[in-house]
Amino acid sequence: MNDVATIHATEREQARMGDLLELIPSRGESVLDIGARDGYLARLLADRFTRVVALDLVRPDVADPRVESVEGDATALNYADDAFECVVCAEVLEHIPEASLERACHEIIRVARHAIVIGVPYKQDLRYGQSKCQACGRINPPWGHLNVFDEHRLEALFGAVTPARFSFVGHNRDRTNAVSAGLMRFAGNPYGTYDQDEPCVHCGAKLQPPNGRTLVQKIATKAAYTIERVQQAFVTERANWIHARFDKVAERVGGGEP
Protein backbone atom coordinates (compact mmCIF):
# COMPACT_ATOMS: atom_id res chain seq x y z
CA MET A 1 0.00 0.00 0.00
CA ASN A 2 1.24 3.47 -0.86
CA ASP A 3 2.11 6.02 1.85
CA VAL A 4 0.06 9.00 0.65
CA ALA A 5 1.90 11.49 2.88
CA THR A 6 5.21 10.46 1.35
CA ILE A 7 3.76 10.62 -2.16
CA HIS A 8 2.39 14.15 -1.65
CA ALA A 9 5.84 15.32 -0.55
CA THR A 10 7.60 14.20 -3.73
CA GLU A 11 8.72 16.75 -6.31
CA ARG A 12 6.74 14.89 -8.98
CA GLU A 13 3.49 15.06 -7.00
CA GLN A 14 4.03 18.67 -5.99
CA ALA A 15 4.44 19.58 -9.66
CA ARG A 16 1.21 17.78 -10.54
CA MET A 17 -0.72 19.43 -7.72
CA GLY A 18 0.72 22.86 -8.44
CA ASP A 19 -0.31 22.67 -12.07
CA LEU A 20 -3.85 21.63 -11.15
CA LEU A 21 -4.13 24.60 -8.79
CA GLU A 22 -3.06 26.91 -11.62
CA LEU A 23 -6.17 25.85 -13.55
CA ILE A 24 -8.59 26.13 -10.63
CA PRO A 25 -10.18 29.53 -9.88
CA SER A 26 -8.33 31.43 -7.15
CA ARG A 27 -11.54 32.04 -5.23
CA GLY A 28 -15.17 31.09 -5.41
CA GLU A 29 -18.35 30.06 -3.68
CA SER A 30 -18.32 26.26 -4.06
CA VAL A 31 -16.20 23.43 -5.42
CA LEU A 32 -16.66 19.67 -5.74
CA ASP A 33 -13.52 17.51 -5.57
CA ILE A 34 -14.34 14.16 -7.18
CA GLY A 35 -12.00 11.35 -6.17
CA ALA A 36 -10.77 13.18 -3.08
CA ARG A 37 -9.10 10.14 -1.46
CA ASP A 38 -7.27 11.50 1.61
CA GLY A 39 -8.52 15.05 1.03
CA TYR A 40 -5.13 16.63 0.31
CA LEU A 41 -6.43 18.71 -2.60
CA ALA A 42 -9.72 19.44 -0.84
CA ARG A 43 -7.85 21.05 2.06
CA LEU A 44 -5.97 23.28 -0.36
CA LEU A 45 -9.23 24.22 -2.06
CA ALA A 46 -10.66 25.26 1.31
CA ASP A 47 -8.28 28.24 1.18
CA ARG A 48 -10.04 29.39 -1.99
CA PHE A 49 -13.69 28.37 -1.78
CA THR A 50 -16.40 29.02 0.78
CA ARG A 51 -17.84 25.51 0.42
CA VAL A 52 -15.69 22.47 -0.38
CA VAL A 53 -17.18 19.01 -0.92
CA ALA A 54 -14.77 16.05 -1.03
CA LEU A 55 -16.38 13.05 -2.74
CA ASP A 56 -15.17 9.50 -3.23
CA LEU A 57 -16.59 5.98 -3.48
CA VAL A 58 -15.72 5.59 0.20
CA ARG A 59 -16.39 8.67 2.31
CA PRO A 60 -13.05 10.50 2.65
CA ASP A 61 -11.66 10.99 6.14
CA VAL A 62 -10.62 14.64 5.93
CA ALA A 63 -9.43 16.24 9.16
CA ASP A 64 -10.53 19.76 8.23
CA PRO A 65 -13.79 21.33 9.44
CA ARG A 66 -13.94 23.44 6.27
CA VAL A 67 -14.35 20.33 4.10
CA GLU A 68 -17.60 18.38 3.74
CA SER A 69 -16.82 14.70 3.09
CA VAL A 70 -19.36 12.58 1.22
CA GLU A 71 -19.65 9.14 -0.30
CA GLY A 72 -20.63 9.22 -3.95
CA ASP A 73 -20.20 7.94 -7.48
CA ALA A 74 -18.95 10.11 -10.34
CA THR A 75 -21.38 8.38 -12.71
CA ALA A 76 -24.43 9.33 -10.60
CA LEU A 77 -23.80 12.56 -8.69
CA ASN A 78 -26.51 13.32 -6.17
CA TYR A 79 -26.54 17.06 -6.84
CA ALA A 80 -28.69 19.46 -8.80
CA ASP A 81 -27.69 20.94 -12.13
CA ASP A 82 -25.12 23.75 -11.77
CA ALA A 83 -24.71 22.94 -8.07
CA PHE A 84 -21.01 23.86 -7.89
CA GLU A 85 -19.16 26.85 -9.25
CA CYS A 86 -16.20 24.56 -9.98
CA VAL A 87 -15.80 20.79 -10.31
CA VAL A 88 -12.36 19.17 -10.04
CA CYS A 89 -11.83 15.56 -11.12
CA ALA A 90 -8.20 14.46 -11.00
CA GLU A 91 -6.81 10.92 -11.25
CA VAL A 92 -10.31 9.45 -11.55
CA LEU A 93 -11.47 9.08 -15.16
CA GLU A 94 -8.72 6.58 -16.00
CA HIS A 95 -10.27 4.19 -13.43
CA ILE A 96 -13.85 4.32 -14.75
CA PRO A 97 -14.93 1.44 -17.03
CA GLU A 98 -15.26 2.45 -20.67
CA ALA A 99 -19.01 1.79 -20.67
CA SER A 100 -19.52 4.35 -17.88
CA LEU A 101 -16.98 6.98 -18.90
CA GLU A 102 -19.26 9.20 -20.99
CA ARG A 103 -21.86 9.11 -18.23
CA ALA A 104 -19.30 10.32 -15.67
CA CYS A 105 -18.24 13.18 -17.92
CA HIS A 106 -21.88 14.12 -18.50
CA GLU A 107 -22.45 14.22 -14.74
CA ILE A 108 -19.41 16.44 -14.20
CA ILE A 109 -20.68 18.87 -16.82
CA ARG A 110 -24.20 18.78 -15.38
CA VAL A 111 -23.29 19.75 -11.80
CA ALA A 112 -20.67 22.36 -12.77
CA ARG A 113 -21.82 25.97 -13.05
CA HIS A 114 -18.67 27.56 -14.42
CA ALA A 115 -15.30 25.76 -14.36
CA ILE A 116 -14.30 22.11 -14.83
CA VAL A 117 -10.73 20.95 -14.16
CA ILE A 118 -9.68 17.46 -15.24
CA GLY A 119 -6.43 15.59 -14.59
CA VAL A 120 -5.52 12.23 -16.15
CA PRO A 121 -2.40 10.34 -17.28
CA TYR A 122 -1.25 11.36 -20.77
CA LYS A 123 -1.09 8.75 -23.55
CA GLN A 124 -0.30 5.99 -21.06
CA ASP A 125 0.87 2.64 -22.45
CA LEU A 126 -1.43 0.29 -20.53
CA ARG A 127 0.68 -2.73 -21.47
CA TYR A 128 3.60 -1.43 -19.41
CA GLY A 129 3.53 -2.70 -15.81
CA GLN A 130 0.63 -5.11 -16.19
CA SER A 131 -0.07 -7.48 -13.31
CA LYS A 132 -1.76 -10.86 -13.03
CA CYS A 133 -4.44 -11.53 -10.44
CA GLN A 134 -3.61 -14.65 -8.45
CA ALA A 135 -7.31 -15.10 -7.59
CA CYS A 136 -8.91 -15.06 -11.05
CA GLY A 137 -5.84 -15.39 -13.28
CA ARG A 138 -6.70 -12.40 -15.45
CA ILE A 139 -4.40 -9.59 -16.56
CA ASN A 140 -4.74 -6.16 -14.96
CA PRO A 141 -3.63 -2.81 -16.37
CA PRO A 142 -1.14 -0.79 -14.30
CA TRP A 143 -2.63 1.06 -11.32
CA GLY A 144 -6.13 -0.05 -12.29
CA HIS A 145 -6.13 2.35 -15.25
CA LEU A 146 -8.69 1.40 -17.88
CA ASN A 147 -8.58 4.36 -20.27
CA VAL A 148 -6.01 6.29 -22.29
CA PHE A 149 -6.32 10.04 -22.78
CA ASP A 150 -4.92 12.86 -24.86
CA GLU A 151 -6.24 16.35 -25.55
CA HIS A 152 -8.41 15.14 -28.44
CA ARG A 153 -10.19 12.52 -26.38
CA LEU A 154 -10.81 14.96 -23.54
CA GLU A 155 -12.25 17.47 -25.99
CA ALA A 156 -14.57 14.77 -27.34
CA LEU A 157 -15.72 13.66 -23.88
CA PHE A 158 -16.32 17.25 -22.79
CA GLY A 159 -17.65 18.48 -26.10
CA ALA A 160 -20.59 20.27 -24.46
CA VAL A 161 -18.27 22.75 -22.73
CA THR A 162 -15.53 25.07 -23.94
CA PRO A 163 -11.86 24.05 -23.65
CA ALA A 164 -9.97 26.93 -22.05
CA ARG A 165 -6.51 25.49 -21.46
CA PHE A 166 -4.47 22.29 -21.57
CA SER A 167 -1.25 21.79 -19.64
CA PHE A 168 1.24 18.94 -19.57
CA VAL A 169 3.11 17.86 -16.45
CA GLY A 170 6.05 15.58 -15.74
CA HIS A 171 8.10 13.31 -17.99
CA ASN A 172 7.51 9.73 -19.02
CA ARG A 173 9.35 7.14 -21.10
CA ASP A 174 7.41 4.07 -19.89
CA ARG A 175 6.69 2.17 -23.06
CA THR A 176 6.68 -1.45 -24.11
CA ASN A 177 5.79 -3.42 -27.23
CA ALA A 178 3.66 -6.39 -28.19
CA VAL A 179 6.53 -8.89 -28.00
CA SER A 180 7.76 -7.76 -24.56
CA ALA A 181 4.21 -7.58 -23.22
CA GLY A 182 3.54 -11.11 -24.46
CA LEU A 183 6.74 -12.44 -22.88
CA MET A 184 5.85 -10.78 -19.58
CA ARG A 185 2.40 -12.37 -19.64
CA PHE A 186 3.99 -15.76 -20.26
CA ALA A 187 6.29 -15.12 -17.28
CA GLY A 188 3.31 -14.31 -15.04
CA ASN A 189 3.81 -10.53 -15.04
CA PRO A 190 6.21 -10.69 -12.07
CA TYR A 191 7.00 -6.96 -12.04
CA GLY A 192 3.56 -5.41 -12.36
CA THR A 193 2.21 -2.63 -10.15
CA TYR A 194 1.45 -4.94 -7.23
CA ASP A 195 1.96 -2.18 -4.66
CA GLN A 196 -1.14 -0.36 -5.92
CA ASP A 197 -4.16 0.16 -3.67
CA GLU A 198 -6.60 -0.67 -6.47
CA PRO A 199 -7.87 -4.29 -6.51
CA CYS A 200 -8.23 -6.54 -9.52
CA VAL A 201 -10.44 -4.80 -12.08
CA HIS A 202 -12.07 -8.15 -12.90
CA CYS A 203 -12.82 -9.86 -9.57
CA GLY A 204 -12.01 -7.26 -6.90
CA ALA A 205 -9.32 -9.33 -5.16
CA LYS A 206 -6.17 -7.72 -3.84
CA LEU A 207 -3.35 -8.07 -6.35
CA GLN A 208 -0.42 -10.18 -5.18
CA PRO A 209 2.83 -10.91 -7.05
CA PRO A 210 3.43 -14.51 -8.18
CA ASN A 211 5.21 -16.74 -5.68
CA GLY A 212 7.87 -17.93 -8.09
CA ARG A 213 8.88 -18.45 -11.71
CA THR A 214 10.24 -21.34 -13.68
CA LEU A 215 13.61 -21.06 -15.41
CA VAL A 216 11.84 -20.61 -18.74
CA GLN A 217 9.73 -17.78 -17.29
CA LYS A 218 12.86 -16.08 -15.96
CA ILE A 219 14.43 -16.29 -19.41
CA ALA A 220 11.25 -14.81 -20.92
CA THR A 221 11.38 -11.94 -18.42
CA LYS A 222 15.00 -11.17 -19.30
CA ALA A 223 14.20 -11.28 -23.01
CA ALA A 224 11.29 -8.87 -22.51
CA TYR A 225 13.52 -6.37 -20.69
CA THR A 226 16.25 -6.69 -23.32
CA ILE A 227 13.81 -5.84 -26.11
CA GLU A 228 12.46 -2.89 -24.09
CA ARG A 229 15.99 -1.54 -23.56
CA VAL A 230 16.56 -1.58 -27.32
CA GLN A 231 13.19 0.10 -27.82
CA GLN A 232 14.10 2.92 -25.40
CA ALA A 233 16.58 4.32 -27.93
CA PHE A 234 13.62 5.15 -30.16
CA VAL A 235 11.16 6.32 -27.49
CA THR A 236 10.25 10.00 -27.39
CA GLU A 237 9.77 11.43 -23.92
CA ARG A 238 6.32 12.83 -23.26
CA ALA A 239 4.34 14.28 -20.38
CA ASN A 240 3.15 12.06 -17.56
CA TRP A 241 -0.15 13.90 -17.05
CA ILE A 242 -2.49 16.11 -19.02
CA HIS A 243 -4.60 18.69 -17.19
CA ALA A 244 -7.53 20.45 -18.80
CA ARG A 245 -9.68 23.44 -17.87
CA PHE A 246 -13.13 23.66 -19.45
CA ASP A 247 -15.51 26.57 -19.04
CA LYS A 248 -19.23 26.02 -19.08
CA VAL A 249 -20.98 28.46 -21.40
CA ALA A 250 -24.76 28.40 -21.10
CA GLU A 251 -25.35 28.88 -24.82
CA ARG A 252 -23.09 25.95 -25.72
CA VAL A 253 -24.43 23.54 -23.09
CA GLY A 254 -28.11 24.29 -23.40
CA GLY A 255 -28.33 25.62 -26.90
CA GLY A 256 -29.68 29.02 -25.82
CA GLU A 257 -32.50 30.87 -27.50
CA PRO A 258 -32.84 30.50 -31.26
Q: Which residues does each predicted region cover?
A:
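Hydrophobic anchor at the start of a short beta-strand
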Residues: 52, 116, 161-166
